[in-house]
Amino acid sequence: MSEAGNVASGLGLPGEVSQWSLKRYGRFMLLDNVGSPGPSSEAAAAGSPTWKVFESSEESGSLVLTIVVSGHFFISQGQTLLEGFSLIGSKNWLKIVRRMDCLLFGTTIKNKSRMFRVQFSGESKEEALERCCGCVQTLAQYVTVQEPDSTTQELQQSQGPREAGESQGKDPLQQGPSLTLEQHVCMAAGAGVLQERTSVTHRAQSILAPEKLTLAYEGSSWGTEELGPFLRLCLMDQNFPAFVEEVEKELKKITGLRN
């Protein structure tokens, strides 16, 4: 179940939102063993897969998964944005697999692939599963969520606490919840460049043009109260800078034709 409706004031998000607390967020990394000569060159070519895990804590901040009514998806820790993209039309490039209280995401955009996964938090295992199910229901409005081990989950739930505990003793975020999906994402276009954490301010600075508009174009029909939240929403979408770049290219084409 979602924990909040309009409580995304910390990130300045407009509109109704649904949020879920996370225990962990993991980002799949493929470390290149460049400069490793000798017999291990074949292993170096394959790379060393590992997971960079972020924990929810008082020091680093709480991990939160947010889905805005507009279809925007975010994962944040405090004021830091870890993931951000639009779920609209995501069936073509986004794959999601559920395993117990964890979700594994695989994306392939412009021949670049990456993966990340989340584990939901809760006072009990049942509460974490409930939050995961609530998030899956919201995600299902935009993209299919695969549950290949649903039969296994039912068997584990039918077991006693001791048997279930033994089968779930390992940290699910450190396991490979769906090796086939990981292989599919990695083989689709090789290991993509993984984004590091970034702030909304830094992203705004990276696409803000230094030129100042002439006086004739300085007016705007949008008020500051409306424009601010809208821009923050756009900047938190990791594909927005590429969109701005495409718009700039088209504008240059138009001005070139007119000149």
UniProtKB/Swiss-Prot annotation:
Residues 203-254 are annotated as: Interaction with MEI4. Its main location: nucleus. One of its GO terms (biological process) is meiotic DNA double-strand break formation. The keyword Ribosomal protein does not apply. It comes from Mus musculus (Mouse). Residues 150-160 have a biased composition (Polar residues). The gene is Rec114. One of its GO terms (cellular component) is chromosome. The lineage of its organism: Eukaryota, Metazoa, Chordata, Craniata, Vertebrata. This is Meiotic recombination protein REC114.
